[in-house]
Every structure is written in structure tokens, then in C-alpha cells.
UniProtKB/Swiss-Prot annotation:
Cross-link (Tryptophyl-tyrosyl-methioninium (Tyr-Met) (with W-92)): Y225-M251
Organism: Blumeria hordei (Barley powdery mildew)
GO biological process: cellular response to hydrogen peroxide; hydrogen peroxide catabolic process
Protein name: Catalase-peroxidase
Lineage: Eukaryota, Fungi, Dikarya, Ascomycota, Pezizomycotina
Record: active site: H93 (proton acceptor)
Catalytic EC class: oxidoreductase
Length: 730
């Protein structure tokens, strides 16, 4: 049924109609905490991807992928008879959504096949790339995930065109529903950017000074990176370089990596703009059911091959678009460039007074003059980019190596530690952006050691709440998106984490000094090479203190190692510092987000469910673990004991709450006596105001809720403490 005939925009079944978010758009939503559960996985809760992958014929898969590169299909023919450039773009656009500020995006979950990514304008026609892969995915089944296959295909594509690669690691399990946690922007129109610059700077139209809102890295809604025509479509290479630098830095790429990726990526393939985009139909998510997930139906001539429309630009960068070369940089500096229009009406650049020697993608008798994008010329017009580009031009081996390393980083930046990596092509060289942690090459502590260490820790004189606080501070840096942070490595003792305000540096220093002495004493008394890492000891100390506070056993799993300062990129790790952390009652609302929204966001990074979030906050409050030692949210007369008092007192109808300090904090007042009994934050009161969180809080606040709170808190605590111990699963 065509769009004009479709009456089902507001269906009266399957969840259609007006929703709560339509009535109350500012209401705190918990959807992001209910995603990617075992119930949503058709492979079942017992399926283990790492085990399935071990049975994969990896070399057979790579051979099939290499054969696919030149197996051009009539329904979507390959440019130049080779799909290499097409699949490089697919891999790039799958991984390239990663941003370092919040660790979200990237290719680690196979989200490229789900909305909105599968229908972004910048991903035009990549639905065909995924469809070309289906026979191979079908053949190998669940031994290879879509997430791994997308990126491995791009790697094989480069190899098949003579490019150097640095290696490849599999290990990305698929998810089975569209990601609902990532903030892609507030714009409501494709390719809009009014909100992301309005929220980031005073003058959103000044392309030379405006600031992109954090944590975004893309300059338009629906683009992976920058506008290839220039900022807002203005063909200004200098301003374009500014956008490029902002975007690539937020992807964790420095200037050299940025130049290598752009120059290397544009060595291959072409762009597509045979005619205006008015010839294109709906994107996959908006296409009719008979399209079977394919979108952008093209009414221009054949609608494929030489008539393809994607970006609207029509550029073939080199004379060897299916072979690695240095021609891209050679042409960039050899020619002067003049602004022209593509057949689709887009701004692009053509070499002045140059002969036509660039091959056509389909007609062997047709040649084109060299052409470039505004973003290409940015590498020549920006001084730093130009310097790097000229060095690569003069040193092709450096260029090839830099591209291989930057490409590897692009594909693996959100993979997490090497304990997650699978396959025979894992490079031996460790890179600083991997957040390396030494391998354990010594016996780890036994249960007897654990028991003895707990006794020594608890008698050390350090407040038990401070031990819990330190363990939480160490473990809760974990980000489920890019698998960074966590307790392994004990980076809480290193810059920059040791100096973060949220970690209360003076208190942290005292705790770490005491634990360091216990560590030294234990290690010096051992024979046979056994040692306890500070990373393990920090978590053990928290567990021991919690055990004392709860009166029940708390599990502990050893196996962490201590990273060095040299293994820690200070600038990169600075992205993990929280603006607000409701678990520790740190921070306050910003003009863009209330404190309770940031609490849920942090809970999502920790892969928590709504009940886990609720139990943890309520438990941490009565354990007296606020970052600054304040009584905010400590709704109990017996701080330091794990009880359900937080919920009992928050839900007490005899208490009324009055906002203070711009409604960031609230006084709990006895309705009869007007006595001020408590003070709480937005991160506290949300458990009584948000209906779904209140429902959970009522379970814990009931007369029979104390035992359940203790049980659930310890389970959630144990989960957080071990989030980055991926080896525990295997």
C-alpha cells in the first residue's frame, strides 16, 4: 500500500495511540533500563557467543567475504566490479557512531540494522550492503554475529584491495532491539542541526565559533560525522576542518588519525549523486511492507549502478578506486580546485585544467576529471591537517601504517579489554587506547587469604562507609557502551580519577594509603609469587564492610590487576568523570538535564534494571556513602547499617517535602510538628515521585521488605563490582 493510502499512522492496536510521553514529555522514562534482556534474545539466555564463535571456520568465512567482493549482483551491481568501497563504508558507518564522551554508539552491538541508524540519510543504500551479506550470515549462522560481520567485512574489503590492516578482533554479541538509550539530538527533521548548536553555543549559525552540544559528535541529525559539502552545506574548507576536528576528537581520534582515516578511506570507492534526491523513496523504516526492509527506492532511470543516488555527491577520488594507493593525497596537492555542482545539485570540487583520467564505475569508455569534497580540501586548508597530509604524501609507508592503526582503532574503540576479544587476528601490540591492564601471571589469593585480609581491613581503623564508598567509586566508572572503566586496573589511584571531586580526593588518599600498607604487608609475606592487587583489595574492602553492615555474606571474586600511570591516557579517561552521580548524591541539574535523568543515564551505563537502581540508591544512602559525607538522603537513625529505612522514611505520609536551593534539594518536614527531619536531593525524592520507581520502592519499604532489600542490594552490588571482569563468564 502506498504512503498516500496508508491510514495506519495512528493504529488502534499494537501500542498505538497517545502515550504517557505525549501527555507528560518531561516525565522520567525508565525504558533505557529495560533493554537487551535475555527475554528479548531469540538465541536464549544460555547462548554464549564466545563459545559459538570458537566453532567458526574463520578462514572459510574470510574467503567467502573476499569472494563476495567481486561477485557483482544484478539487483545491486558493484562499482568498478568490486564491492570493496561499499563495504568499507558499511563498516565505517557501523563503528563510526561511537563517541568518547559517553561511550555510546559504535559497532559493538550490531545496531546498524535497527532504527534509527538503518534509516539515517548518511546510511543511504547500506541496506543493500547488509542484504548482500545475508547469504554468508545465513551460512555461518550464530557462529558469527552481525556486529562482528559488519566490521570484519570492511576489514576484508581493505585487504582485498591491497590495503594494510593492523589485525581484527571479534567478540561483539548482537543485541535484538533498537537502542533507546543513546541521545542522537533533539532535531525532528533529518539533517537538521538547529538544536545541537543552539544548546551548545550562543550563536548557532556562526560556523567559525559555534559549539556542538555534548555528548554529540555528528554535526547533523542523521549524519555519522560532518557535512561533506561543508558546515550547513556551505563549501568552506577552513570551517569544515573545524567541524572535522570537533567530530573526530569526540570519536577519540587525534589529528594524525583523522587525516589517515579520511585520506585512507577516500582512497577507495566513490560517492553517488547521479540525480537529485527527489527521485528517492522512503528510508527502510518508512518503506512499505513489500520492500522487506529495503529503502530509498530510486526512480531515476535504472535506479542502480550508474544511476545510484546516495549522498547526492558524485566523486571518484582516485584513478585506482579498488586498490590502495597514495593517489588521493597526490591529487589533493597537485591540483587547484574550483567549486562545481554534482548532477544531484550538491557542492563539490573539480580539479582545474585537469584531463579526464578517472575511470567510470560502469562505463570503461568514460573518464572523469579528479573531484573532491569540501571535507577533502579541509586537509589542505587547515595548517595541522596539511602538515600531516604532506608528511603522508612524502612517506607512503607511514601513511599506510597510520591508516591501518586508525582503522583498527575505529573498529575496536568500543570493544573493551582484550579479555573480550576473539579470533586468530588479534594483534600482539597493545595500544594505549585499549586501556591496557597487565595479565595476571601469578597465583591469586585463596579463600583463606580473603578471610584473613577482610579481618585486617576491618580492623584498620578506616570507617566502613569509606571502604564501601571507595569500592563503589572504583567500580562504578564502568560504561556498558564501550566497556571502559570499572575496578580492574585500580585506576582510581591514578590521574585523573584520583583527583575527581566526586571521589573526595582527601578521603580517597587516606583509604588508599591504608589499603596500600595492607597490600604491601601481605605481598611481602608470601612465597610462590602470590600477590593481591590493589584493584582486588579495594573491592574486597568494600565487600567486607558491606558484609559487616548487612550481617550476611557478600560474594567476592578476585582476579583484577593494577594498571600503571603509563598505561592510562589521562585525557581520554577524563571523559569518564561524571557531571553528576546520583548514587553518591554528587552534582545537580544542568540546563539540559535534571539530576534524576542523569541518575538513570548513569544506571544505564552500569547496565542496571529499575529494581537494581532502586535497591542500590536506597542501600547506599543508609550506608552513609555520599561523596562528601553529607546527610542528604540518609533517611535513617542508624547510618552504616544496611536497612530499608531509606524507603520507609521516604514513603512516610507524615512527612511533607519542601523545595530549597532552586528545587535541587528538599526538606522533609513533620506534618504535625513542623520539625525538619530530613534533607534529600532530586536523586532521592524521585523514588517517591516517579510512579514506576515508587512502585519498586514500596516493595522495599514494606514491613517485609528489609530482607529483600538486603538480598537485592548485595546482588546488584556484586554485579557492579564485577562488571569489567569479563573473564568470570568464561
Amino acid at each position: 500500500m502506498g504512503d498516500s493510502k496508508c491510514p495506519y499512522r495512528d493504529a488502534n492496536v499494537a501500542g498505538g495511540g497517545t502515550h504517557n510521553k505525549d501527555w507528560w514529555p518531561e516525565t522520567l522514562k525508565l525504558d533505557a533500563l529495560r533493554q537487551h534482556t535475555a527475554e528479548s534474545n531469540p538465541l536464549g539466555k544460555d547462548f554464549d557467543y564466545a563459545s559459538a564463535f570458537k566453532t567458526l571456520d574463520y578462514e572459510g568465512l574470510k574467503k567467502d567475504l573476499k569472494d563476495l567482493m567481486t561477485d557483482s549482483q544484478d539487483w545491486w551491481p558493484a562499482d568498478f566490479g568490486h564491492y570493496g568501497g561499499f563495504f568499507v563504508r558499511m563498516a565505517w558507518h557501523s563503528a563510526g557512531t561511537y563517541r568518547s564522551i559517553d561511550g555510546r554508539g559504535g559497532g559493538g552491538q550490531g545496531q546498524h540494522r535497527f532504527a534509527p541508524l538503518n534509516s539515517w540519510p548518511d546510511n543511504g543504500n547500506l541496506d543493500k550492503a547488509r542484504r548482500l551479506l545475508w547469504p554468508i550470515k545465513q551460512k555461518y549462522g550464530n557462529k558469527i554475529s552481525w556486529a562482528d560481520l559488519y566490521l570484519l567485512t570492511g576489514n576484508v574489503a581493505i585487504e582485498s584491495m591491497g590495503g594494510k590492516t593492523f589485525g581484527f578482533a571479534c567478540g561483539r554479541p548482537d543485541t535484538w532491539e533498537a537502542d533507546d538509550a543513546t541521545f542522537w539530538g533533539n532535531e525532528t527533521k533529518w539533517l537538521g542541526n538547529d538544536a545541537r548548536y543552539k544548546n551548545g553555543s550562543k550563536d548557532p549559525k556562526d560556523i567559525y565559533t559555534r559549539q556542538l552540544e555534548k555528548p554529540l559528535s555528528a554535526v547533523h541529525m542523521g549524519l555519522i560525522y560532518v557535512n561533506p559539502e561543508g558546515p550547513d552545506g556551505i563549501p568552506d574548507p577552513v570551517a569544515s576542518a573545524r567541524d572535522i576536528r570537533t567530530t573526530f576528537r569526540r570519536m577519540a581520534m587525534n589529528d594524525e588519525e583523522t587525516v589517515a582515516l579520511i585520506a585512507g578511506g577516500h582512497t577507495f570507492g566513490k560517492t553517488h549523486g547521479a540525480a537529485p534526491a527527489t527521485h528517492l523513496g522512503k528510508e527502510p523504516e518508512g518503506a512499505p511492507i513489500e520492500a522487506q526492509g529495503l529503502g530509498w527506492a530510486n526512480s531515476y532511470r535504472s535506479g542502480k549502478g550508474p544511476d545510484t543516488i546516495t549522498s547526492g555527491l558524485e566523486v571518484i577520488w582516485t584513478k585506482t578506486p579498488i586498490n590502495w594507493s597514495n593517489h588521493y593525497l597526490e591529487y589533493l596537492f597537485k591540483y587547484d580546485w574550483e567549486l562545481t555542482k554534482s548532477p544531484g545539485g550538491a557542492n563539490q570540487w573539480t580539479a582545474k585544467n585537469a584531463e579526464a583520467f578517472i575511470p567510470d564505475a560502469f562505463d570503461p569508455n568514460k573518464k572523469h576529471p579528479p573531484r573532491m569534497l569540501t571535507t577533502d580540501l579541509a586537509l589542505r586548508h587547515d595548517k595541522e591537517y596539511e602538515k600531516i597530509s604532506l608528511r603522508f604524501l612524502e612517506n607512503p609507508d607511514q601513511f599506510a601504517d597510520a591508516f591501518a592503526r586508525a582503522w583498527f582503532k575505529l573498529l575496536h574503540r568500543d570493544m573493551g579489554p582484550r579479555s573480550r576479544w576473539l579470533g586468530p587476528e588479534i594483534p600482539k601490540e597493545e595500544l594505549i587506547w585499549e586501556d591496557p591492564i597487565p595479565e595476571i601471571d601469578h597465583p591469586i589469593i585463596s579463600q583463606e587469604d580473603i578471610n584473613n585480609l577482610k579481618k585486617e581491613i576491618l580492623s584498620s581503623g578506616v570507617g566502613h562507609n569509606k571502604l564501601i564508598q571507595t569500592a563503589w567509586a572504583s567500580a562504578s566508572t564502568f560504561r556498558g557502551g564501550d566497556k571502559r572503566g570499572g575496578a580492574n586496573g585500580a585506576r582510581i589511584r591514578l590521574a585523573p580519577q584520583k583527583d575527581w571531586k566526586v571521589n573526595n580526593p582527601p578521603q580517597l588518599t587516606c583509604v588508599l594509603e591504608t589499603l596500600g600498607k595492607i597490600q604491601s604487608s601481605f605481598n611481602s609475606s608470601q612465597t610462590g609469587g602470590k600477590i593481591v592487587s590493589l584493584a582486588d583489595l579495594i573491592i574486597l574492602a568494600g565487600c567486607a564492610a558491606l558484609e559487616k553492615a548487612a550481617g550476611v555474606p557478600v560474594p567476592f571474586s578476585p582476579g583484577r590487576a593494577d594498571a600503571s600511570q603509563e598505561q592510562t591516557d589521562i585525557k581520554s579517561f577524563s571523559n569518564l568523570e561524571p557531571v553528576a552521580d546520583g548514587f553518591r548524591n554528587f552534582g545537580r541539574s544542568t540546563p539540559r538535564a535534571r539530576a534524576e535523568h542523569m541518575l538513570v543515564d548513569r544506571a544505564q551505563l552500569l547496565t542496571l534494571t529499575p529494581p537494581e537502581l532502586t535497591a542500590l540508591v536506597g542501600g547506599l544512602r543508609v550506608l552513609d556513602t555520599n561523596f562528601d559525607g553529607s546527610s542528604c538522603g540518609v533517611f535513617t537513625k542508624r547510618p552504616g547499617q544496611l536497612t530499608n529505612d531509606f524507603f520507609v522514611n521516604l514513603l512516610d505520609p507524615a512527612i511533607s517535602w519542601k523545595g530549597i536551593d532552586e528545587d535541587e534539594f528538599f526538606e522533609g518536614i513533620d506534618r504535625k510538628t513542623d520539625e525538619k527531619k530530613w534533607i534529600g536531593s532530586r536523586a532521592d525524592l524521585v523514588f517517591g515521585s516517579q510512579a514506576e520507581l515508587r512502585a519498586i520502592a514500596e516493595v522495599y519499604g514494606s514491613a517485609d521488605g528489609n530482607e529483600k532489600l538486603i538480598k537485592d542490594f548485595i546482588a546488584a552490588w556484586n554485579k557492579v563490582m564485577n562488571l569489567d571482569l569479563f573473564n568470570l563468564a568464561h
